[in-house]
Amino acid sequence: MTDFITSGPLTVSPIGAHLISAEFPTGDILFLSSTAKFEEGSAIRGGVPLIAPWFGTLLDKQPSHGWARTTTWEVMDGEKISAGLEKDGFELQVDIWRTDEGFEMTMGLSNQTDNTEKVQLAFHPYFRVGDIAETTVSGAEGLEVLDRLTDETATQEGVISFAGEYDRVVLGEPIMVINDGSRTIEVTGRGHDAMVVWNPAAERAAQFDDLGEDEWRNFVCVEPALLGADLQGVDVEPGGSVSIGMVVKVSENS
């Protein structure tokens, strides 16, 4: 088990500079698998994985979702939890802090190579919900949405609900609102161009050895992401930088 860094209600693992807990009066905002692995080289199932310098395999690179989430960062605690990482010619910097209503995060990447590089950045938060079958996500209505399971694009009609595996990219910058009946979680991105919404459902979840039985019912991922035009990344010139942010607010339903 790694040593964690705590600042108020926030707990961070140095592996991935990974926010694993955000305790508030309504309960933890974040889901963490009961069988999550805290080992360098392994992704932590739950919390807020940091996705860089690419998302999934969209840029045809491995490992999926990049190396930021599986590498040990240098983490400094304080009123803000700050972390830094240098790897493969990139410098990454993350800041995490609590607010009265939840928490905020920023992640920046600078290109220290001599070449223009295509990169992608994202936060991949696992938000805790009571039951995914009773949960809705609003904010995408009327926007173009890419279904990553079928590679089809359509306009989102109505709120998002879940009845099976769900993996879609909302193209745009909406404020997304998760409602599980007992509380509301508002997710706002900064510097992003998409929101990814994901839940694996039972069949896909059974393939994960780091997710407890039926725990897929207790989270939804709503992910501010900078993916670039046609999901092919953004160009960062030598010495240049790019950043994204996320604001999370939680409130109890009346």
Positions of the model-derived regions?
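Active-site/ligand-binding surface loops and adjacent short beta/alpha elements
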Residues: 117-118, 126-196
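Extended, loop-rich substrate-binding clefts of extracytoplasmic carbohydrate-active enzymes
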Residues: 62-100
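Short, hydrophobic/aromatic beta-strand segments
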Residues: 21-23, 115-122
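Beta-strand-rich N-terminal accessory domains
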Residues: 1-45, 174, 178-193, 201, ...
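Acidic/His-leaning functional-site neighborhoods
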Residues: 162-238
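Short, acidic/polar linear motifs in exposed loop/turn regions
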Residues: 112-115, 252
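Hot-dog-fold acyl-thioester-processing enzymes
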Residues: 30-67, 191-211
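Asparagine-centered strand-capping/turn motif at beta-strand->loop junctions
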Residues: 12, 107-113
